[in-house]
Swiss-Prot record:
It holds the Pfam family tRNA_U5-meth_tr. The lineage of its organism: Bacteria, Bacillati, Bacillota, Bacilli, Lactobacillales. It comes from Streptococcus pyogenes serotype M3 (strain ATCC BAA-595 / MGAS315). GO terms for biological process: rRNA base methylation. This is Uncharacterized RNA methyltransferase SpyM3_1299. One of its GO terms (molecular function) is metal ion binding. InterPro entries: MeTrfase_TrmA_AS (IPR030390), MeTrfase_TrmA_CS (IPR030391), NA-bd_OB-fold (IPR012340), SAM-dependent_MTases_sf (IPR029063), TRAM_dom (IPR002792), U5_MeTrfase_fam (IPR010280).
Length: 451
């Protein structure tokens, strides 16, 4: 390795990496530079030297890309929540197409060079789209601040005006910090592991109803806090307390208690409504969720005799799009509260052909097959870690005729396709921009069992 830490070097950026960083070569050494764009000539300083590459921080842009824009966010460079706000939005969509191609080229699933990769479906107004926030609380000189940890650190960046966050949720978290200060509520201390760690605020787009989770490592008295908050924001319908006494970086503990208000808020997608409890998973971008689920519906060709498995089903929202036209829908999720929501939602909509069970997909699906259930199609919407090996083996063993893979991580998607393409043909990959200004890429993959 010819470069050293703190060394300053000129660099020509050849391409962009999957995390939104610029990539160039310095005397045959691969260098990753966050904030740099393809085609730019820059000056940077080496911050880390690894076995096969180096990392650097951008110092100056000597020749800027015509696609570079000035981020409107005042904490963009320190926050780390967004990675590509300095790239013009139409080019962000092109970047996400390329991220998929890079992942496929790295893992090389069967036939990947012939896969149809459709242009990413973007937003008309790619700002204030996040309907949910999870901000950390810390004390700064005796004043409470809420925000996000800077990339790769435990240093909190206070945020009072996030440009990708729904404005109501931002207004509410700003009020919460004032009230935590006012009522002298205990703030988390990493040394003592005590106090309020995190605040979750989520808004349902259809109803404007809001739910809040206070994550704390100790008991806190919130009666006055709740009274003043709900008076200021009548949209708040639920306040819950989650107990997390763990030393780990996990946001939530296992126990969540409704302190005030209703058990769930009302949301809608694709013309059907459903209940959403505080701990249940739902997509962060309601506008693009309509687009994403619409693409899932397009990708499956099913009828009245077909049976569908909706793995990682959450509150059942994807499966409900099919329940009215198929023989049966079965779903599972590891969060019991989500399954309770799914069961209640199915009953409320009159879907007596929908069945939901709490647990891991890799455990429940083999059990269903042993009981004689046979799925004609399966929908998987796994976390960023991708499909569990046991679930992959189960799918390859039972081989449903159709499959839709909804991915939030192109690397694990490409990895899983290496196994799935042993049995299935990939008809196309359709990316949907769920997270503008970030490097995160969401994609819907249509797969058909090979004849």
């Amino acid at each position: 390795m010819v470069v050293k830490v703190k060394q300053k070097i000129p660099l020509k950026i050849k391409r962009m990496g999957i995390n939104g960083e610029g990539i160039g070569f310095y005397q045959k050494t691969l260098v990753f530079v966050p904030g740099a764009l393809k085609g730019e000539n820059i000056f940077c300083q080496i911050t880390a030297v690894k076995r096969n590459f180096a990392e650097a921080k951008l110092l100056t842009v000597n020749k800027a890309s015509k696609n570079r824009v000035k981020p409107a966010c005042s904490v963009y460079e320190t926050c780390g929540g967004c990675q590509i706000m300095h790239l013009a939005y139409p080019k962000q969509l092109d970047f996400k197409d390329d991220v998929i191609r890079q992942a496929l080229k790295k893992f090389k699933p069967t036939g990947y060079e012939q896969f149809e990769i459709r242009p990413t479906l973007g937003m008309k107004k790619p700002d204030h789209y996040r309907a949910k926030l999870q901000f950390q609380l810390r004390s700064f000189g005796g004043t409470v601040k809420a925000g996000l940890f800077s990339q790769g650190s435990h240093r909190l960046v206070p945020i009072d005006n996030c440009l990708v966050q729904d404005q109501l949720t931002q207004d509410i978290i700003n009020k919460i910090t004032q009230l935590v200060d006012k009522y002298k509520l205990p703030i988390y201390n990493e040394r003592k592991i005590a106090g309020i760690r995190t605040i979750m605020v989520r808004k349902a787009q259809a109803s404007d109803q809001v739910q809040i989770i206070v994550v704390s490592s100790k008991e806190v008295r919130l009666a006055n806090f709740i009274g003043e908050l709900t008076k200021a924001f009548p949209q708040v319908k639920t306040v819950a307390l989650n107990s997390n006494r763990s030393k780990s970086s996990e946001i939530y503990g296992d126990e969540t208690e409704i302190l005030w208000g209703q058990e769930a808020i009302h949301e809608e997608v694709l013309d059907y409504g459903f209940a959403l409890s505080p701990r249940a998973f739902y997509q962060l971008n309601p506008q693009q969720t309509e687009v994403l689920y619409g693409e899932v519906v397009k990708a499956l060709d099913v009828g009245s005799k077909d049976h569908i498995i909706d793995a990682y089903c959450g509150v059942g929202s994807i499966g409900f799009a099919f329940a009215g036209k198929v023989k049966s829908v079965r779903g599972m999720d590891i969060i019991p509260e989500a399954i309770e929501d799914a069961q209640k939602n199915a009953k409320a909509m009159g879907f007596d052909n929908a069945y939901y069970e709490a647990g891991k997909a890799e455990d429940i699906i083999p059990k269903w097959y042993k009981q004689g259930y046979r799925a004609d199609a399966i929908i998987v919407d796994p976390p960023r870690t991708g499909l569990d090996d046991k679930l992959l083996k189960t799918i390859l063993h039972y081989q449903p005729k159709q499959m839709v893979y909804v991915s939030c991580n192109t690397s694990t998607l490409a990895r899983d396709l290496v196994q799935l393409t042993k049995v299935y043909d990939v008809h196309y990959i359709q990316s949907v921009d769920m997270f503008p200004h970030t490097a995160r890429t969401e994609a819907v993959v249509k797969l058909q069992k090979r004849v």
